[in-house]
UniProtKB/Swiss-Prot annotation:
Keyword set includes Ribosomal protein: yes
Native organism: Methanococcus maripaludis (strain C6 / ATCC BAA-1332)
Keyword Ribonucleoprotein carried by entry: yes
BP GO annotations: translation
Identification of the protein by name: Small ribosomal subunit protein eS6
Keywords for the protein's UniProt record, in alphabetical order: Ribonucleoprotein, Ribosomal protein
Gene Ontology annotations for the cellular component aspect, listed alphabetically: ribonucleoprotein complex; ribosome
Membership in a protein family: Belongs to the eukaryotic ribosomal protein eS6 family.
GO terms of molecular function: structural constituent of ribosome
Length: 124
């Protein structure tokens, strides 16, 4: 199973996509910090911020486990409220990465020695 890992650079506002076959990500939760070596970014530390499964259902931080659930939502990730007081039942994935998850969103917490994305640093 291949994971697409999107790494967001908080300094520049750019994001970079990597693919990995690593099983080290299975069992990790939203909010956990992982080593950048999982996606060949030596020296980087990444924080998991979300993701989606093979059917496109978003992961949500307050649903524990790796299963897919239909939950009643007022707001937050996975549902955008159109009018005040409106609630809706939506299918969402839990906060734990499993083999069904295909996309993992991360952000950089600690930067490594090499520039992100293989771009040369501007030394001017």
């Amino acid at each position: 199973m291949a994971f697409k890992v999107v790494v967001s650079d908080t300094k520049s506002g750019k994001s970079y996509q990597f693919e990995t076959e690593s099983t080290a990500l299975i069992g990790k939760k939203i909010g956990d910090e992982i080593s950048g070596s999982v996606v060949e970014l030596e020296g980087y530390k990444l924080k998991i911020t979300g993701g989606s499964d093979k059917c496109g259902f978003a992961m949500r931080h307050d649903i524990h486990g790796a299963m897919k659930m239909r939950v009643l939502l007022k707001n937050g990730p996975g549902y955008n409220v159109k009018e005040k007081g409106l609630r809706r039942r939506k299918s969402l994935r839990g906060n734990t990465i499993s083999k069904d998850v295909t996309l993992i969103n991360t952000k950089v917490v600690e930067y490594g020695p090499a520039p992100l994305g293989g771009e040369p640093e501007n030394t001017e």
